[in-house]
């Protein structure tokens, strides 16, 4: 990380100086805001943490509960989510505290000893090279803690307003400044019944499956239920089951159980299949107790013992997959130039719900907000046209439907009994195979956005085949030329709203002044059509909107910084300090770590990889196609 840009400042560099633009936190909610976020779950806090980086955007986040979450609910953190946490600069802390999921084992009835279970398979949880981060497990409350700390340490010093419930949301599309009016009711004992009104430019409902914001804009969760009750419990238990510290899927004659080891080395989560429900029956009517969950888990684990000592948290739920047709207040099914601009959005469980079996609920919700946050910031800061906001619903609804389809099949296979002989059910081998085949999806790296205003046509994909247009930027190791430090290239991308331009030089670029990379630098630095010149505000650092990074195919010892264009060594900040962290080489020291080979980059021609602020590849272009680069940004950015 970089700091001391504008002079030496002692103390923790992760605590940004408080901005004079940010108002002090008050007990009462502000009367007017740019963005009102409803809900302090994963979706709401991801959005709040991202917007907190911009003190010129007035953000307010409210929550119905009276304080931060302390226990329970989601715990799985996918590889893709860890990549996002790196952008928020707390991935390392999560890695130290979390439980890493390395292998998954599969158990079924022992054909040699009826009534007992036996291990029949083992697979690696995520395939090699899928991400630089593992799949980990950590209590959702601790994830919230990291986001809250990020917000407190931001230039905005953003903090939630708790104990507020949404009563009403009204939209006046004729109002120019603050078209959305939200009525809140305070629900803590000291202020019960007090009414507050907030006017906002935009409202985002991250208030869960029973979202009041969703209801206010007339959206509905549509889908079905599997009519199957499940229980979930976090336990401290003594057991002789040998795989209790692995992720385990058990299909037995007594039912089905999913075991998830938790952080700390002792805590374990059990998902326990319970009763089949009648049509239209709610799980609450069964009055299932934690004692029943424990007894069922003990029967499924036979002949192994399970002595539960403590249950910090437990719950019951029914499997269901539901989704909204759109994630904003615009009535048109497909936005047109005549469509009104969206003013109210929904994210996370407010717009899609599914079973927890694949561990995607919290992860997918955070990706919703990561998609929306940079777009709101770009529009509010007048960097992009407001029509950009239509892409939130169009991008996220489609991939959520893909998740629903996967989850429906996965949950069904998990609930079906293990097939034995000629009897019905699911073949345990097919169950294991399905898990392996969909590993990219469960790791969170399977999202693929279709061509659109933001996503190119992939006409030049062959120049960098491993950076698929429309998918997340798949990081790889590099060596920084200025100090020979090995690092991950993707970790240059922070949650700061900036675009990344990764320019991979051709083999002969260093020796040829008219080469693709050097010509690109001249174009970006001085041409009137350059996006850097057109869209970077006057007086700001040259990389404040577009962060250009160069990667040469030669070893770092063969790249002379003093011969490179000034754009790759830009002066920045009040003191004009040089940024020495823009130039990289592949890791040629360790076999199999060359980024050009790993990501299929054309070593002769090179390539320009354009990456969105949410870490998704927007374009792969030839280094010399300056017109295409300009046309892309001109389609949605404002000068």
Swiss-Prot record:
UniProtKB keywords: FAD, Flavoprotein, NADP, Oxidoreductase
Consequence recorded when altering residue 292 to R: In MobA3-1; able to hydroxylate 3-aminophenol
Known cofactor(s): FAD
Enzyme's top EC category: oxidoreductase
One annotated GO molecular function: FAD binding
Catalytic activity: 3-hydroxybenzoate + NADPH + O2 + H(+) = 3,4-dihydroxybenzoate + NADP(+) + H2O
Oligomer and partners: Homodimer.
Family statement: Belongs to the PheA/TfdB FAD monooxygenase family.
General function of this protein: Converts 3-hydroxybenzoate (m-hydroxybenzoate), and to a lesser extent p-hydroxybenzoate, to 3,4-dihydroxybenzoate (protocatechuate). Also acts on a number of analogs of 3-hydroxybenzoate substituted in the 2, 4, 5 and 6 positions.
The protein's name: 3-hydroxybenzoate 4-monooxygenase
Organism this protein belongs to: Comamonas testosteroni (Pseudomonas testosteroni)
Gene coding for it: mobA
């Amino acid at each position: 990380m970089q700091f001391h840009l504008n002079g030496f400042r002692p103390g923790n560099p992760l605590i940004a100086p408080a901005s004079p633009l940010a108002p002090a936190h008050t007990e009462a909610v502000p009367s007017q805001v740019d963005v009102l976020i409803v809900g302090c779950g994963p979706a709401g806090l991801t959005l709040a943490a991202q917007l907190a980086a911009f003190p010129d955007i007035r953000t307010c986040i409210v929550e119905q509960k009276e304080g931060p979450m302390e226990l329970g609910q989601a715990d799985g953190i996918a590889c893709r989510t860890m990549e996002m946490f790196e952008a928020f600069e707390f991935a390392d802390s999560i890695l130290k505290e979390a439980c890493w999921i390395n292998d998954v084992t599969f158990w079924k009835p022992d054909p040699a000893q009826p009534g007992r279970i036996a291990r029949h398979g083992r697979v690696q949880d995520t395939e090699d090279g899928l991400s630089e981060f593992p799949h980990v497990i950590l209590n959702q409350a601790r994830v919230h803690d990291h986001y809250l700390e990020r917000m407190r340490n931001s230039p905005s010093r953003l903090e939630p307003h708790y104990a507020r419930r949404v009563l009403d949301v009204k939209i006046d599309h004729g109002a120019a400044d603050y078209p959305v009016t939200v009525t809140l009711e305070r629900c803590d004992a000291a202020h019960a019944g007090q009414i507050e009104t907030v006017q906002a430019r935009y409202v985002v409902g991250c208030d869960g499956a029973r979202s009041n914001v969703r209801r206010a804009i007339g959206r509905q969760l549509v889908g079905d239920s599997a009519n199957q009750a499940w229980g979930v419990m976090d336990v401290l238990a003594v057991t002789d089951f040998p795989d209790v510290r692995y992720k385990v899927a058990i299909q037995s004659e007594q039912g089905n159980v999913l075991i998830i080891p938790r952080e700390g080395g002792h805590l374990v989560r059990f998902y326990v299949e319970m009763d089949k429900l009648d049509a239209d029956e709610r799980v609450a009517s069964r009055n299932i107790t934690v004692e029943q969950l424990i007894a069922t888990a003990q029967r499924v684990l036979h002949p192994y013992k399970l002595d539960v000592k403590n249950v910090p948290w437990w719950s019951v739920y029914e499997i269901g997959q539901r989704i909204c047709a759109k994630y904003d207040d615009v009535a048109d099914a497909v936005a047109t130039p005549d469509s009104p601009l969206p003013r109210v959005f929904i994210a996370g469980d407010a717009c899609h719900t599914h079973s927890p079996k694949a561990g995607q609920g919290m992860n997918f919700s955070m990706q919703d907000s990561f998609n929306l946050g940079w777009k709101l910031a770009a529009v509010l800061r007048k960097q992009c046209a407001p029509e950009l906001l239509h892409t939130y619903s169009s991008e996220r609804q489609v991939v959520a439907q893909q998740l629903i389809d996967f989850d429906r099949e996965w949950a069904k296979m998990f609930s079906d009994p293990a097939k034995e002989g000629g009897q019905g059910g699911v073949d345990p081998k097919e169950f294991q195979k399905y898990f392996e085949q969909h590993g990219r999806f469960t790791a969170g790296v399977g999202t693929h956005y279709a061509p659109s205003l933001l996503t190119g046509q992939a006409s030049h994909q062959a120049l960098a085949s491993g950076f698929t247009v429309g998918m997340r930027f798949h990081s790889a190791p590099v060596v920084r030329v200025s100090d020979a430090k090995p690092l991950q290239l993707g970790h240059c991308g922070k949650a700061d709203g900036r675009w990344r331009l990764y320019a991979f030089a051709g083999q002969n670029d260093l020796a040829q002044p008219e080469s693709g990379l050097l010509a690109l630098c001249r174009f970006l630095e001085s041409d009137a059509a350059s996006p850097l010149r057109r869209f970077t505000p006057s007086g700001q650092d040259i990389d404040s909107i577009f962060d250009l990074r160069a990667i040469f195919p030669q070893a770092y010892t063969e790249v002379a910084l003093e011969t490179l264009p000034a754009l790759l060594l830009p002066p920045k900040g009040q003191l004009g300090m040089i940024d020495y962290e823009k130039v990289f080489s592949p890791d040629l020291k360790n076999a199999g770590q060359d980024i050009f080979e790993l990501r299929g980059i054309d070593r002769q021609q090179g390539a320009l990889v354009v990456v969105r602020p949410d870490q998704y590849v927007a374009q792969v272009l030839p280094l010399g196609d300056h017109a295409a680069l300009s046309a892309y940004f001109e389609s949605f950015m404002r000068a």
